[in-house]
């Protein structure tokens, strides 16, 4: 049986969510093609002749981009079984099914995809016009080394720019999935509900090895929180450094875990970690409490200090625009970033992110959130909301426009930050009242990944114009 697996967006990385199920499907004798539409054009003949088409939907941006592609595939091959899988698939199952999706799989998806594919091959699947109940599998799996040979080569993906201007080819892998925390705004929670799954260490190392052989000089670990299983994590990076002493990497870790497991930060640094991405989200303690983030403003400051003590970069991410933020609060966020000397560590899109409230979000437990929303909007994949102060929504739109335009012209982060600051002061009516000393445009000594956008941001017009 001919199978096609499709990814639309994975933060500029070679998609683990394509490469992993390919191995499982090939082992069962299926003929599998993959298409990463973020990097390559779709081959019409491949989808027309496929009997099973799978769409990998890991987060918001990828799913928004995938919607018109799913519709087009269904129109061009109405007899193909279409499967949507990944974190965002079960949360949007009803909408996806109306687009033509037959099966929906969330959580640990590889084994379920194989099971469905076998049923389709044996003609045991429901009629193509029927749909299955969405499945969320949290069964532990024995992972297999991902098959990456048919994906675009690593050099075509996002690269790492070093302080001296040199570039490194970047690979991507995952050591865990899910998360043991229950942050209210996080889209992982409705699917994994506080559980995380470990990818066996030998699989992770073997996956890294094949990417090093393919030219990877740096590895991004895509785990939602690398320190969910801190013992597992430190064993993997120790083995990584033992095998490839010159290989660098980056990880994502909660502020709470950076503080709690501070003794392991030096291990990260000593084994080649260049920087840690951390979801700070806000510098307002009341907002952090509403989000149930597990850290405070002071903890954020402490994490910055701890990372600097071992010369480990910290790249904060934010949900900058949220129902409880004020104009003054947003200005405080910018001022805090400036005072902590983090301007070059914050990707500009982070200053434009507007809170997304997906189906099943714990934010809907809060009465003041419910009163702000107007019901679930399937096409936008979230509950739309308006700020009680229209000026905040206007500022968010202006900041997003600044960032999107700046991404086209390759402006330095310091210049983008300056423009956002000026727009904020204009929105507050304080154009001439606050004088700020901005860092020079050549002050950055931080490595950073070249991908401009983010998994929780609305896709740009260019991203939505995928040609199939």
Language model regions located:
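Alpha-helix C-cap/termination motif
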Residues: 28, 75-76, 98-99, 214, ...
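A structural motif corresponding to the C-terminal lobe/cap of the Radical SAM core domain
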Residues: 230, 241-422
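Radical SAM [4Fe-4S] cluster-binding motif and immediate context
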Residues: 152-313
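Radical SAM enzyme core and accessory elements
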Residues: 2-6, 26-27, 31-34, 41, ...
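Acidic, low-complexity intrinsically disordered segments
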Residues: 1-209, 213
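Cofactor-binding loop segments of dinucleotide-utilizing enzymes, especially the Rossmann-like FAD-
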Residues: 8, 37, 87, 224, ...
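Short acidic/polar active-site loop segments enriched in Thr and Asp
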Residues: 51, 102, 217, 274, ...
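Conserved strand-to-helix beginnings and helix N-cap segments that scaffold or border functional pockets
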Residues: 15-18, 63-67, 198, 230-234, ...
